[in-house]
Amino acid sequence: MSYNTHHNIGSGSRTARTLEFGRTHVVRPKGKHQATIVWLHGLGDNGPSSSQLLESLPLPNIKWICPTAPTRPVTLLGGFPCTAWFDVGELSEDGSNDWEALDASAAHIANLLSTEPADVKLGIGGFSMGAAMALYSATCYALGRYGNGNPYPVNLKAIVGLSGWLPGARSLKSKVQSSHEAGRRAASLPILLCHGISDDVVLYKYGEKSAHSLTSAGFRYLTFKSYDGIGHYTVPAEMDEICHWLTPKLGLEGYRS
């Protein structure tokens, strides 16, 4: 099942500019619906292609929502337009951050989750830039607000990031530690990060650095997995890790090994 969304994002964007998100593909649960996870693609990719990987996972109790990012000029590509959750000059936490687009995309993702049933647990995952977006959403959840100060509306139960990085890492610790509630939410949110040691697109050291930034800011429920000889792509071992990790974190009944 897929559909397009073209609407104005107001809750996460300073200027409430109109962003045209592309096709969203939904992978329906094959068993009892216990969890919904929004899965976010990498730079230049799309939601339907992500869904092909997720459909084969032995997780029958999860509904996967796979949106497509807006097409925008990307500084890293010399201004060439492609699908991107936000503009980026380099694929690391050392680069400058496109806060307006980060907030707008985070609001779009939260909106996709906001209509799920109350008894369904909610999560966000992604690959590369999608992982960066998932981690930014995790920080918004912990802080209780987007970067622009508007309230973050969704109660997240799990975050998965493959081959990604953490936007806003430099200021995260001080923000989380300034609020008891933010610290409590950060400490209780399970996060799984996986990164290939041979990744030459988002370097492994940036994955390590992001994990350290998160844990030092109070995200203590974090697991970091490294993979020898693996570059900037997913492998079956990572997907197996996701299945084994998500099952107890979300209390899933129907995991098939």
Regions found by a protein language model. Name each.
Residues 28-30, 149-255:
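The feature captures the conserved acid-bearing segment of alpha/beta-hydrolase catalytic domains
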Residues 39-40, 125, 162, 194:
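Short hydrophobic segments within beta-strands
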Residues 57, 141-145, 218:
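Active-site catalytic pocket residues across diverse enzymes, especially alpha/beta-hydrolases
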Residues 52, 136-140:
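Active-site signature of alpha/beta-hydrolase-fold catalytic machinery across serine-
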